[in-house]
Design a protein with these regions (language model features):
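Membrane-interfacial terminal anchoring regions of lipid-handling membrane enzymes
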Residues: 1-261
């Protein structure tokens, strides 16, 4: 929402313009926040809309997905199962995208205190410069997105879903997305040992990204990999009518809803 974001920069500039000399200028802060959860309840419908628009005649949506029995199934799951949500709060920013300290002072890349007012000064005066403020909006938006990535919390459900889909893609490199979604049921199986090894490798990369400060992960991602995988499978698409990922009787990984996966 760049237009909404731009309004914070305009407001900060107006505060500098309207505050009488000698008075403290109120400062506007941006605090990135992410909500992290195992699945998106409306994902099947959102994905269906996207695939219909992108695939057109290459995509045939499923008809009559929600009958009376499906509604009863959903309500039963909704009232008998639970799922976790975590809230991640990032570092505070000023309207230019600089980090701020505990006292609200803006900091440059070297951690030195800087005056945000200087960003709005031209020839010694506070000025209105639309082009300049559009550039500030772009910088601020990029900083917020990078903070979203940094504080985003990876769950086991995210990992198992990512690994499974990537493995199916690599098994069928000649198929595009819509060809992949039409895979016959007998090809929608991943051997558990192969899946387990890939999950361990991906988890190791997640740990490395966390050490670099690029991402975060839930505490349940640590520990025995089989328990982590089980936790992920138990929670991915927990309320959806068709589970996007689960384990079959032979102990291998399958999907009942490739589209949602």
């Amino acid at each position: 929402k760049l237009g909404l974001l731009n309004s914070t920069i305009e407001a900060q500039r107006n505060l500098f313009l309207d505050t009488p000399p000698g008075e403290e200028v109120r400062k506007i802060f941006i605090v990135p926040v992410t909500l992290n959860y195992h699945f998106v309840l409306e994902a099947p419908d959102l994905i269906d809309e996207y695939l219909s628009a992108k695939g057109q005649d290459r995509y045939l949506p499923e008809q009559d997905k929600y009958g009376s029995w499906q509604l009863i199934q959903f309500l039963f799951k909704f009232f008998t199962k639970g799922s976790n949500i975590s809230v991640s709060i990032g570092n505070g920013l000023d309207v230019i995208g600089n980090y701020v300290d505990d006292h609200g002072n803006s900091l440059d890349a070297q951690g030195r205190i800087i005056d945000t007012r200087d960003y709005f000064v031209s020839n010694g005066d506070i000025t209105v410069d639309k082009q300049r403020e559009d550039e500030y909006t772009r910088i601020l938006s990029q900083k917020i997105v990078s903070e979203y990535h940094r504080i985003n919390r990876i769950f086991a459900s995210h990992m198992v879903a990512f690994v499974a889909f990537e493995m199916w893609q690599k098994k069928h490199p000649k198929l595009d997305l819509f060809g992949l979604l039409r895979l016959p049921e007998e090809d929608q199986v991943i051997q558990y040992e192969e899946f387990r090894k890939t999950c361990k490798r991906v988890r190791k990369q997640i740990y490395a990204l966390k050490e670099q400060g690029k991402v975060y992960h839930a505490t349940h991602l640590k520990g025995n990999i089989d328990l982590v995988i089980r936790h992920g499978l138990d929670n991915v698409g927990i309320f959806h009518l068709k589970r996007p990922l689960l384990m079959n009787k032979e102990g291998n990984i399958i999907t009942k809803d490739f589209n949602t996966l």
